[in-house]
Amino acid sequence: MEIDCMKTRDIIHNDKILARYIPATEAWGSSDLSFFSQDEEYIQAGSWNYNKGKKLLAHTHNEVERSVLFTQEVIYVKSGSLQAYIYDDNSILVEEITAYADDVLIMLSGGHGYEILEDNTKVLEIKNGPYLGAEIDRDRLNLDG
């Protein structure tokens, strides 16, 4: 099923959030600070939209031990477009999403893959760490069986 929507929405399968799609109009349309992640999610993603002169209070982040069981990632499409394929934990395709310039995708669980739709598509990918290497951090989906 391919969805091409203009509102932030969760891709849910069997009561589990697999991904979150934030179109450009919502990612960058609000004023102030807007977070798209839930507090309990391993990765936190939000956007700023402030006017000149806004000052953000200087701060540090406290050392806090956290238990992180999965790698989650955020994809920001800077330019071009891509097709995102969202899979459940059993490698079953649940949904396809077309993402365009300035759209954001948060991959929370299950599997995913991408197809670049335009030349010179530029994407910023952000993941939680530490990175333990491809052999430990990920499994390739067997989509033939």
Residue ranges and their predicted role:
Residues 51-52, 70-85:
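Glycine- and acidic-residue-biased ligand/ion/polar-headgroup-sensing regions
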Residues 58, 84-85, 105-107, 112-118, ...:
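Short beta-strand His + acidic residue motifs that chelate non-heme Fe in jelly-roll/DSBH
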Residues 47-69:
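Conserved short histidine dyad/triad with adjacent acidic residue
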Residues 1-52, 143:
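A short, N-terminal "cap"/entry segment at the start of jelly-roll beta-barrel domains
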Residues 113-145:
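Double-stranded beta-helix
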Residues 64-65, 90-92, 129-131:
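Short, surface-exposed beta-strand-loop junctions and turns on beta-sheet-rich folds
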Residues 88-109:
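Short acidic-glycine-tyrosine-enriched beta hairpin
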